[in-house]
Amino acid sequence: EKMRNGLLADFSAPEVQESFRHCKTLLARFRTMSTYDADYRSVLEQLIPGIPATTVVVPPFHCDHGHGIRLGEHVYINAGCTFLDGACITVGDYTLIAPNVQIYTPHHPLDYRERRESKEYSYPVTIGKDCWIGGGAIILPGVTIGDRCIIGAGSVVTRDIPSDSLAAGNPCLLYTSPSPRDS
């Protein structure tokens, strides 16, 4: 509960470790699957409860818990993505996430003494509807990306991106809003 609310949480706590264990057991099966395997949907629905039938996650995929991931309708997550879901990760309808995208919600304390005690904060990440997140992009804790955004491949998104934006780079910079004919 502390994790989901941005409070300093102990990730070595038994309930957190049990959540990790459950997730890793499902991921061990999921990583070896194809989207065409008979059990694919069943394992995916156990991993990410409430996932819409129209949403696809291509293995291999990595997450910490799975139950912190909220995906909209017609979302497509390509192979090799990592979603560290200590806090909620929300992805809007019709969003495309290219291969090897990493979304992080955990943020370790700056004080080394707290890091030694297996403590961390987690801040939610929200990606709007109709977005395209380019391959290898990294989205840091607490970021919100508005609707209809394009994030360039390899970008490191450190701050919020407003709707209808094209942003890219390391750190990710806002370049333009898409033209009306591209909408």
Where do the PLM segments sit?
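Extended, small-residue-rich solenoid/repeat segments and analogous flexible loops
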Residues: 8-9, 14-68
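Walker B catalytic motif
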Residues: 171
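SAM-dependent methyltransferase catalytic-core segment centered on the flexible catalytic loop
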Residues: 115-118
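Left-handed beta-helix
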Residues: 53, 58-59, 64-67, 72-73, ...
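Charged, compositionally biased N-terminal leader segments and the immediate start
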Residues: 1-5
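Histidine-centered active-site/metal-ligand motif
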Residues: 108
